Amino acid sequence: MKRTYQPSKLVRKRRHGFRARMATAGGRKVIAARRARGRKRLSA
């Protein structure tokens, strides 16, 4: 059985990137929560 994590920069950006987050209401909440917490990195 192969490992489940097969890294890909493109897939990572598309699924978890800033623009992907901003595209949905829930994603915008995630960014807002991370901003409020003072996270250095907001998204992938």
Curated annotation (Swiss-Prot):
It comes from the Bacteria. The keyword Ribosomal protein applies. One of its GO terms (biological process) is translation. GO terms for cellular component: ribonucleoprotein complex; ribosome. GO terms for molecular function: structural constituent of ribosome. Keywords: Ribonucleoprotein, Ribosomal protein. InterPro entries: Ribosomal_bL34 (IPR000271), Ribosomal_bL34_CS (IPR020939). PROSITE patterns: RIBOSOMAL_L34 (PS00784). HAMAP family: Ribosomal_bL34 (MF_00391). NCBIfam families: rpmH_bact (TIGR01030). Belongs to the bacterial ribosomal protein bL34 family. This is Large ribosomal subunit protein bL34. It comes from Bartonella tribocorum (strain CIP 105476 / IBS 506). The lineage of its organism: Bacteria, Pseudomonadati, Pseudomonadota, Alphaproteobacteria, Hyphomicrobiales.
